[in-house]
A protein has these predicted regions:
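A generic transmembrane alpha-helix motif of multi-pass inner-membrane proteins
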Residues: 340, 353-354, 361-417
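Helix-loop-helix junctions that connect adjacent transmembrane segments
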Residues: 1-3, 41, 45, 114, ...
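Membrane-interface "cap" regions at the ends of multi-pass membrane proteins
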Residues: 1-30, 35-39, 51-52, 56, ...
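Juxtamembrane helix-boundary/capping and inter-helix hinge elements in multi-pass membrane proteins
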Residues: 35-38, 66-70, 77-83, 202-210, ...
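Alpha-helical transmembrane segments
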Residues: 296-304, 346-362
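Hydrophobic transmembrane alpha-helices that form the core helical bundles
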Residues: 31, 52-132, 137, 268-289, ...
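Membrane-interface loop-to-helix entry segments
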Residues: 110, 116-166, 174-177, 215-219, ...
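TM-loop-TM module centered on a large, flexible mid-protein loop between adjacent transmembrane helices
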Residues: 73-74, 80, 112, 216-279, ...
Length: 417
């Protein structure tokens, strides 16, 4: 049964923005400043440019292949089944880790230490239930959460503007080339989410026109927001931001706006929920597409006849995220997620390069630069994250080899019978 096309341009933009404006914008500035130092603006520009290149490739592919699954489906069509499978696997496992990171960040802002893990798990369960009620409700809830998040970020920008004139922050340290790239990699985690729209190709109205516009609009808006937030943090806190657990609340406190600190905390929690909501939706759709193609158990390809959502896929994703929340920490989840996400977009750029001239909407150079950017940022990740990510990708390859062998044997047995 096909999915229902219900999402408008505004819905798609809200889902993309809700995916990007999540845990990253509230947590990434300390580590990014610690890595990039005085070159933070350069790191932000690098991350934004790589994200833009990836977005153009995703938009071009989505226009030619308006189906659920994102780069998994695009790579299957443009390169081959194996490449598509690796892309889908990287997306699913990487974004499941992102879901866990978003849930942990929500709980960190919303609950005292002893209650954070149970609350994070409860948030995952609740949002999976929202997804199972139907994609229209998912889009509406995401739009509400994005508005709340932007209000909190507006408070931070205003507080930073108020305090920057009187503040005397410690100067930022000089940066190394590796530090700038590491900072860009951290900031890229905060951008990831724009192509979430492309994974919902079977649910967007007029996808060939809507998806490219939605990706560009959402990314442009988020770049502007991040530039304003980064400026407020640097001008108010300076080098002290590197050691801050919650730099955005520190900016508001430095301005003397103590009464508004809870507003920022609520916004952080809302942003994390918004990103988690959109992530679960995107992962569920990719899992649905892979199961429909026989790459994963067929049970995951079933669509709820009433709600028109892949309920089994959503429930499985939610269960795995809860397990990670109960067993891992935030840093580990983010590091592993970055590895999977960058490989996913590397394959997206490679797929865009394989498209015929008639399907190109953007210069080939953007796809080349996007692929190179992904490779460079992967190389700048911590060694532990790279080793774990490589092991999980190889595990996925082994899983497909076993699945294909079992399928061939089953077919031979059926033929003999």
């Amino acid at each position: 049964m096909p999915l229902s096309r219900r999402l408008s341009l505004a819905d798609a933009v809200a889902i993309g923005a809700g995916s990007m404006i999540g845990a990253g914008v509230f947590a990434v500035w300390g580590p990014a400043i610690g890595a990039a130092g005085a070159a933070l603006p350069t790191a932000l520009l690098i991350a934004a440019f790589v994200a833009f290149c990836n977005a153009t490739s995703s938009a071009q592919l989505a226009a030619a292949h308006p189906v659920a699954g994102g780069t998994y489906a695009y790579a299957r069509a443009e390169i081959g089944p194996w490449t598509g499978y690796v892309a889908g696997w990287c997306f699913v496992v990487g974004k499941i880790a992102s879901c866990a990171a978003m849930a942990m960040t929500f709980a960190a802002y919303a609950a005292p230490p002893g209650w954070r893990t149970p609350l994070a798990a409860a948030a995952v369960v609740a949002l999976v239930a929202v997804n199972c009620l139907g994609v229209t409700r998912t889009a509406l809830a995401t739009r509400i959460l994005v508005v709340v998040s932007l209000l909190g970020l507006a408070v931070v920008v205003a507080a930073g503007a108020s305090a920057s004139g009187a503040a005397s922050p410690a100067p930022l340290p000089d940066a190394t080339a590796y530090g700038v790239l590491q900072g860009a990699g951290l900031l890229f985690f905060a951008f990831a989410g724009y192509a979430r729209i492309a994974t919902m190709g079977e649910e967007v109205v007029a996808p060939a026109r809507t998806i490219p516009r939605a990706i560009v609009i959402a990314l442009t808006g988020v770049v502007i927001v991040y530039a304003l937030i980064g400026g407020a943090v640097v001008l108010t806190l300076g080098a002290d931001a590197a050691g801050a657990a919650s730099p955005l609340t520190d900016v508001v406190s430095a301005a003397g706006w103590q009464a508004l600190v809870p507003v920022v905390r609520v916004a952080a929690a809302a942003a994390s929920l918004g990103a988690l909501l959109a992530l679960i939706t995107g992962i569920g759709r990719t899992t649905f597409a892979m199961a429909r193609d026989g790459e994963l158990p067929r049970l995951l390809a079933r669509v709820d006849p009433r709600r028109h959502v892949p309920r089994n896929a959503e429930l499985l994703v939610g269960a795995v995220v809860v397990v990670i929340v109960l067993s891992a920490d935030l840093r580990g989840a983010i590091g592993f997620s970055s590895f999977g996400v960058l490989l996913y977009y590397l394959i997206a750029n490679a797929s865009a390069l394989r498209q015929p001239v008639t399907a190109r909407r953007y210069p080939r150079l953007l796809a080349v630069l996007g692929a190179l950017g992904c490779l460079v940022l992967v190389a700048a990740l911590p060694v532990e994250a790279s080793l774990l990510g490589t092991a999980v990708v190889l595990l996925g390859v082994l899983l497909r080899l076993i699945t294909r062998a079992v399928t061939r044997r089953s077919r031979r047995d059926t033929t003999r019978a």
